[in-house]
A protein has these predicted regions:
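N-terminal Sec/ER secretory leader and immediately downstream segment
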Residues: 1-35
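Extended amphipathic alpha-helical interaction segments
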Residues: 21-108
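Long amphipathic all-alpha helical oligomerization modules
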Residues: 70-163
């Protein structure tokens, strides 16, 4: 950080790190809200995709990067500006990936229901007419629209983190 560009790069990394941290808190709040609006979506989305495993993996990766940044501090482990900035950028990238996974998880929990699990289980085993398929599709679309409306209505009345 001996040059102006090194100092500016460090400030930019720290600023984006703070913004990503706030986005992570907001994304966690969105997952919580999705679970409140559609509790059956938790169990339904578990079998529909592997987002839970991917999200846990991103949490662990981000925790390790954060632990590495914190462990490298102190007088015994002095880092130069380039190393410090590189660690902050790595942490920022990990937080961005974590935020993306959390947002995908909240959408998955909001949209999926046990009807989707049942339909996936019986796919190809029971012949359905076009009329039945159209009714199920319409019902699924109405449910998704209703859940999204509930989600945004809840978000408007309970804004996270002072927004």
């Amino acid at each position: 950080m001996k040059t102006a560009s090194g100092y500016a790069s460090a400030i930019k990394a720290a600023t984006s790190l703070y913004a990503d941290g706030m986005q992570t808190l907001t994304a966690l709040w969105e997952v919580h809200t999705a679970c409140r609006i559609n509790p059956q979506g938790i169990a339904a989305s578990l079998s529909m995709n592997n987002l839970y495993l991917e999200t846990v993996t991103e949490f662990i990766r981000t925790y390790r990067a954060l632990k590495n940044v914190i462990a490298k501090g102190g007088e015994g482990n002095m880092l130069n500006g380039a190393e410090r900035t590189q660690m902050l950028w790595n942490l920022t990238n990990n937080l961005e990936r974590l935020n993306r996974k959390l947002r995908l998880l909240s959408v998955s929990v909001t949209m999926h229901s046990l009807d989707d699990v049942w339909n996936r289980a019986i796919t190809g085993k029971i012949n359905k007419s076009n009329k039945v398929l159209a009714k199920e599709s319409s019902k699924r679309m109405c449910r998704a629209i209703s859940n999204v409306a509930k989600f945004y209505r809840y978000r408007q009345t309970h804004k996270p983190w002072g927004q």
